[in-house]
Amino acid sequence: MKNEYLLLTPGPLSTSETVREAMLKDWCTWDDEYNKDIVEVIRTKLVKLATQQDGYTSVLMQGSGTASVEATIGSAIAKEGKLLVVDNGAYGARIAQIADYLNIPCHVVSPGETSQPHLNEVETALASDPAITHVAIVHCETTTGMLNPIEAFASVAKAHGKVVILDAMSSFGGIPIDIAELGIDFMISSANKCIQGVPGFGFVIAKQTELEKCQGQARSLSLDLYDQWHCMEVNHGKWRFTSPTHTVRAFYQALLELEQEGGIEARHNRYQTNQKTLVAGMRSLGFEPLLNDELHSPIITSFYSPTHSDYQFKAFYTRLKEQGFVIYPGKVSNADCFRIGNIGEVYPADIERLIGAIEKAMYWQVA
């Protein structure tokens, strides 16, 4: 079945027809053909995508990507631990909110939504507060499309002996990284992002020695990261509680299609071409990106809304959807913006068609 429109969003996103077709079969969660032949293969493939080094493992968690973030924050940090988190958008702020809900002491570094973190501020905080045990940062902050400097951030954190948590929700699978080389201890992502699967579960790729330290520390039963991992390890892919079987099978297919495309490097190149084509086309129509070009990610781009008094996002959105494209509203607190994603089953030719559709949808310029 063909889609009626293209989702130009940061996830859920447009998937291939073959990924959707993979969900047409039912699976028994007790069978080896599901646990060993699908779940365990997924776990192995994820680790290989994340690093070429040994010592890492992966665990899948039911729910949204945020559930996997909460599972990590709530399991990795001991009762006497403290978190430092970079908040330069809604998703960094969400990590701080999770820590607050779980009564985990948290130091927040807030450079603002359109700025990268100042590493000297992070350095000062870590040097002056030995109680901080863990640090967390979002790789691609989809509030704006900002790509944060994770290599430099992790280097500072490791120089102070901290455990590093990376929210790579909207970047893993679309931007090449080696988490072992960067010194990342826990990396979190989701099925419905750059791997191009569908919603239903997230996953954590972790240094096994750090994951094993999580035993007995979880602040939630269903979000116990260690217990979920241990169950999968001992029972060859078995989940503790009901697994989203159709989503898992679709994700397996999506991983195969990532390999067929040429891996993360090839997908990154496609996303980057999409983004550059988008920005050039939007500028030709008079739109300007929120961020400076050097801060852009290939994942999603924020654009300033037109200042014309007749412009309304909902009307603009509706006109685009009628032409087969769905975009995202803005999420920045101090600027009127909208966002356009470049990921999913989307190609440069689609972006070129989008630019034509946007030109037709600019009703406020009609005389």
Swiss-Prot record:
EC number annotated for this UniProt entry: 2.6.1.37
Gene Ontology terms: biological process: organic phosphonate catabolic process
Single Gene Ontology MF annotation: 2-aminoethylphosphonate-pyruvate transaminase activity
Pfam families: Aminotran_5
Cofactor: pyridoxal 5'-phosphate
Gene3D superfamilies: Aspartate Aminotransferase, domain 1, Type I PLP-dependent aspartate aminotransferase-like (Major domain)
Modified residues (N6-(pyridoxal phosphate)lysine): 193
Transferase keyword on record: yes
The reaction(s) this protein catalyses: (2-aminoethyl)phosphonate + pyruvate = phosphonoacetaldehyde + L-alanine
Sorted UniProt keywords: Aminotransferase, Pyridoxal phosphate, Pyruvate, Transferase
Membership in a protein family: Belongs to the class-V pyridoxal-phosphate-dependent aminotransferase family. PhnW subfamily.
Role this protein plays: Involved in phosphonate degradation.
Oligomeric and partner information: Homodimer.
Protein name as catalogued: 2-aminoethylphosphonate--pyruvate transaminase
Natural source organism: Vibrio vulnificus (strain CMCP6)
